[in-house]
Design a protein with these regions (language model features):
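Alpha-helical substrate-recognition element adjacent to the catalytic core
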Residues: 1-105, 166-168
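C-terminal cap/substrate-recognition subdomain and adjoining C-terminal extension
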Residues: 66-209
């Protein structure tokens, strides 16, 4: 048998959208608990379920810069929209010793490095979006740990989602593009989970319907 497959999946703007400025998402998540205020990205639940059906036992780990206190709300949301169950790696909300806001970039990098160390036998499908840091984080990880990354799937945000996410339409800086290309990992992108599933190999998602 080859290495086990695992999935790391971002939450905000990847599997779920709130149509709120990213700077307000933390406070929104902290005080507004209703899962109906969030919308599922089409096809993302189906994509994750196909990965698990094709690779029995593959864990799905949800990685987010959201606060721990919204985990019950997210679990309700995932159950209502038929997302596979999986652990959530969240962060604490509030000021730190170095500033008023915690670094989402560093949180994700730290958690991913920990997964590489704690689960050396797993190769990862990394799923995120192009709104802020995911392409940079995943590209750097694949460049440094190419043998641990099976593929990278990036959801392409709409123009309005880019604005709310605090991102923009400017291409990645050249070193970031080079890191992504030189990583050796398969990189696919699309507007939703259905498009990503069509572009990923059958070894990950099974035969195309």
């Amino acid at each position: 048998d080859g290495p086990q497959l695992g999935v790391v999946c971002d939450i905000d703007d990847t599997v779920m959208v709130t149509h709120m400025p990213r700077a307000l998402v933390a406070s929104w998540n902290a005080f507004v608990k209703q899962s109906f205020a969030r919308q599922a990205v089409p096809g993302m639940a189906a994509l994750l379920n196909r990965v698990q059906e094709t690779n029995p036992g593959a864990p799905v780990i949800y990685l987010s810069t959201g606060a721990w206190n919204v985990v019950p709300t997210l679990r309700n949301f995932f159950e209502r929209h038929n997302f596979p169950r999986g652990p959530m790696l969240m962060t604490d909300w509030g000021p730190t010793n170095t500033g008023w806001f915690r670094s989402g970039l560093e949180h994700k990098r730290t958690q991913l490095r920990r997964l590489m160390i704690d689960l050396p036998e797993v190769k990862w499908l990394l799923i995120g979006d192009d709104g802020q840091f995911d392409r940079i984080i995943y590209g750097d990880l694949a460049h440094d740990h190419g043998d641990k990354v099976e593929a990278i799937a990036i959801r392409k945000l709409t123009s309005s989602e880019h604005v709310l996410a605090g991102g923009n339409h400017v291409a990645l800086a050249e070193p970031q593009v080079r890191s992504l290309k030189q990583s050796g990992a398969l990189v696919v992108s699309g507007r939703d989970g259905f498009t990503l599933a069509r572009k990923l190999p059958a070894s990950l998602v099974g035969p195309q319907p």
